[in-house]
Amino acid sequence: MRKTFAAALAPLLFVLTAASPPELARWRAEASQVTITRDDWGIAHVHGRTDPDAVFGMIYAQAEDDFPRIEANYLTNLGRTAEADGEKAIWQDLRARLYISDNELKADYARSPLAMRRLMDAWADGLNYFLATHPNVHPRALTRFEPWMALSFTEGSIGGDIERIDLDQLKAFYSSKPIAAALTPWHELQGSNGIAIAPKLTANGSSLLLINPHTSHFFRSEQQVTSDQGLNVYGAATWGQFFIYQGFNAHAGWMHTSSGIDVVDEFAEKVERRGTGHCYLYGRVCRPMGFRPVTIRYRKGDGTFGTRSFTTYRTHLGPIVRSANGPWIAFAMMDKPVEALQQSFLRTKARDLASFLAIAGRFKANSSNNTLFADDQGEIAYLHPQFVPQRDDRFNYAQPVDGSDPATDWHGLHALSELPSVVKPASGWV
């Protein structure tokens, strides 16, 4: 080990921080419970007395390694990239704001279980402590982190479901500027893979799990995170998140592949003007169209800031993201940030396949990732994403379906037992 860092002993350079004395005292107390040890490859091995202490150290170590990536990820997911990158990022921010707002995230935080709130509190404290002790680090826009912000970014894959919303079409709808019709571009076929091998096929009689991260080398942080409350996990965390996305603990390992199956749906809505607003046909009723004002703040070339305001629309199925030769298109995807964050963290403490499945079945908040799993009891498995809506198979959901027909609605979620899976295969591998 070439470097040992005790967070409690970090120089407290608080001259430039706006933190209050009670905050500084709290951060010092949290830091005193954390040890970060760097091995010969620079990988952080974090230990905390409690799980929140470990999260405090985990995110502090990530910030040491690459604070700009952490900030960039939260600017993206909070819909605030234009505050750093300027007017060109307005449409990316508007896309994010279709699903989130500060007030909604604060309400989600308030309804979160106490244990999760404590983790989010520690996450924010760790980042703010880092900024307080590193006055030479200059954030582009996020100078302070709040606990509720963690709920904006709960899924660790390369691109979230929301990126299925086309920015050019979103811009055309909300700026009332038509765009030329374009052919769907052809993309080279790509793979996303992992391998789990049962003990009967291995030389040492233990399960094997191959994790292919299929990302650029520095897309995620590599860490070990432990606590006296039983957390003991090693693997890859997407920058800014306080859970190991792909990795293993003392008993089980998991990795994710992305297939894009059952992820999102689009609904073609028949919209009419009603007075000063709009309604959309649903069965025999024209329901009032929901709307929400959104204001995007953006950085100008001279360093000052401007704003641009929009009125966004939504049905009970989701926000309106484009029009298609008349009908407005509502976009439906998983929107369960509290449950998604709980599932992402708690599965890192699963001891075997049964406990991993219990967590997945409890929350059903993994929409875009298949899972390959292996444990030290010799169990291996392939698991489909757990957020799969029940759909009427008379309709082709590969295309926008008729949103005015109630039969096209989602009708709850499938039980795990109804989803594709391969558990303890006779072949001995998946």
What are these regions (language model features)?
Residues 7-15:
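Bacterial N-terminal signal peptides
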Residues 238-303, 344-347:
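Compact, glycine/acidic-enriched structural inserts
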Residues 149, 173, 323-342, 347:
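Conserved, charged catalytic cores of large soluble enzymes
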Residues 215-227, 350, 354-364:
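Short active-site loop/helix that positions an aromatic residue
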Residues 1-4:
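Positively charged n-region of N-terminal signal peptides that target proteins for export
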Residues 233-235, 242, 363-430:
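Hydrophobic alpha-helical segments
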